[in-house]
Amino acid sequence: MGNDLLLGFQADRPTSVSEQQFLPYHLMEDFDKAVVGPDGHKLVKETRTVIKPFTHVVEKEFPLSPTACAICLAAFIIILTLVECKLHKTFWLFDLLLLLLIGVCGAILAVMWFSEHPTVRLNLQILLLNPIALICLLPVVRRERKGKSHWFWAVYFICIILFFIGNILQNYAEGMNILALSLLVRSGMSVWKNKQTPVIQQQKA
């Protein structure tokens, strides 16, 4: 799953012959077929195998698939969000950990935009794993500790909508859409609670 997270939407489009040469095996085949000179002299005289391929046996795999992990995490986020609404509270410590995780992953994706690798530079998954979460982390927590919401959640809600639209252009990593749905619920609920705060304060007054 980690490798899939780094792949952008260009990984899903057909590649040209020159782009396929980025892979050593394809480059080797093209060199083997290459002819130099009018006499038909081949570029490669001989091909030898330095290290023979071998099968790597994984003795113990992680018991859950990426989809199963995404479902468990999404269920936890949604249930926690519903409990918040029921109690009229904000679990700011959970948001602290959540935004930290989102922001760190987003920072990694942002760095990949400067890579020379053609398939990792433009990755729409950065809309979900957003590096802006790191920038807004402390302001969000400060406001939530005072019982208020931050504008970040409204911006993040829009980013997740754009993430879903991005399915047209890119095949996301396994389980990402499930995770995005739970984060859409949480960010949307934060926006809704922000609108409800003045009403609740008036009722208490």
Pin down the residues of each PLM region:
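Generic detector of multi-pass transmembrane helix bundles and their immediately adjacent loops
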Residues: 114-205
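Core alpha-helical transmembrane segments of integral membrane proteins
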Residues: 49-119, 125
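Soluble extramembrane regions of membrane proteins in the secretory/endomembrane system
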Residues: 1-54
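Polar low-complexity intrinsically disordered regions
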Residues: 1, 75, 89, 196-205
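Context-gated lysine
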Residues: 33, 42-45, 52, 60, ...
